[in-house]
Curated annotation (Swiss-Prot):
Transmembrane segments: none annotated. Its EC number is 2.7.8.44. It comes from Staphylococcus aureus (strain NCTC 8325 / PS 47). This is Teichoic acid glycerol-phosphate primase. Catalyzes the addition of a single glycerol phosphate residue to the prenoldiphosphate-linked disaccharide.
Length: 367
């Protein structure tokens, strides 16, 4: 969407949000803007027995996955046709919880008693995002202003460590006063059961008897740059291992494992080794004590096009490989030497993180 179209969209949203008056409702209202269910659903479930009215604005693709939620959750699909309905819901909310960059918020006029809380869809960051992304033309003042309008709509950020707060400050222009050091709701699932038992049960369920290696790469905008690891060759060279390629859903390839029905966190719970690149998943995997090998075949190009941050560049070279042959050799010869990196990114991620957030919501939302 180019700058002029975004500018017009912001204008329409601004006009509508000024025209639409907040609806009178019986209960205090919380609106969730959801692209990633694993970030938002734990919060909604934690509020199941609360007295709040809850509305979820989500993509048409994700809407069906909300059917398991309680009946008192309203769902609005985020399309142009429902724009008025979305703004009506937002206007009556006392708190808005988001998990991503939402263009709508750049034009939306918050009411005086509203707070927007960002629970970002990652435990950390190894690549540039926001205004540090090399794809953003910082010399284009109109483009930068549009991004800033969206970022400035957020009042607070949920974070699990100082490193991520540093990323938000660098990339989104956030301040220390905006940081909520509660930890992230998305990690709550890792504390709800004994991990070793869950791992054994999941492997049994999916018929995996070998060590499981999970490949979860970053999505590349040019689909030709997205590649799976040759499963047959990998398992031939490493007969004691099973490889699963978990690529982005938009990548269609009959040779890639069909694991679309298994969410990434479930696959991670089963895994013995993670293979990734510039994704935040190695940071999340460290919470599970799973080591990561960084298969970075396009490191130079990716750094030039998108940008890799100081935390990526601090990764030891011994954890990086650039070819499938080197990847296989690293597992054969060095697996026992690999330990999880980024464990210090979980200072505030605890089994109390979700409870801390719900207490904060209770404090901030007037009943």
């Amino acid at each position: 969407m180019n700058v002029l179209i975004k500018k017009f969209y912001h204008l329409v949203v601004r006009i509508l949000s000024k025209m639409i008056t907040p609806q009178v409702i019986d209960k205090p209202h919380i609106v969730f803007m959801m692209t990633f269910p694993e970030d938002i659903k734990p919060i909604i479930k934690a509020l199941n027995n609360s007295s709040y009215q809850k509305t979820v604005l989500t993509t048409p693709k994700q809407a069906p996955y909300l059917s398991e939620l309680s009946d008192d959750v309203d769902v609005i699909e985020m399309t142009n046709r429902t724009l008025v309905k979305q703004i009506k819901a937002l206007k009556s909310a006392q708190m808005i919880i988001i998990d991503n960059y939402y263009l709508l918020l750049g034009g939306y006029n918050k009411t005086s008693n509203q707070h927007i809380v960002q629970t970002w869809h990652a435990s950390g960051a190894l690549k540039n995002f926001g205004l540090t992304d090399h794809q953003v033309d910082v010399s284009d003042k109109a483009m930068v202003q549009q991004y800033r309008k969206v970022y400035q709509a957020t009042d607070f950020y949920l974070v699990g460590c100082e490193q991520m707060s540093q990323c938000f400050k660098q990339s989104l222009g956030a301040t220390e006063e905006q940081m909520l050091y509660f930890g992230l709701p998305r990690i709550n699932k890792y504390y709800t059961a004994d991990r070793a038992t869950v791992k054994a049960e999941l492997k049994d369920k999916y018929g995996i008897t070998n060590k499981l290696v999970l490949y979860v790469p970053t999505y590349r905008e040019d689909k030709a740059d997205n590649r799976a690891i040759d499963k047959a060759y990998f398992e031939k060279c490493l007969p004691g291992y099973t490889l699963i390629n978990k690529l982005h859903p938009s990548i269609e390839d009959s040779d890639i494992d069909d694991v679309s029905s298994i969410d990434t966190s479930t696959l991670m719970l089963m895994s013995d080794i993670i293979i990734s690149d510039y994704s935040s998943l190695p940071i999340e995997a460290s919470l599970l004590d799973i080591p990561t090998i960084f298969y970075v075949y396009d490191e130079g190009t990716y750094d030039q096009v998108r940008g890799l941050n100081q935390f990526y560049k601090a990764i030891p070279d011994s954890y990086k490989v650039y070819t499938e042959e080197d990847l296989i050799m690293t597992i054969q010869e060095k697996e026992h030497l690999l330990s999880p990196l980024f464990k210090d990114w979980h200072k505030y991620n605890t089994d109390k993180s979700l409870h801390q957030l719900t207490e904060y919501i209770d404090k901030m939302v007037t009943k």
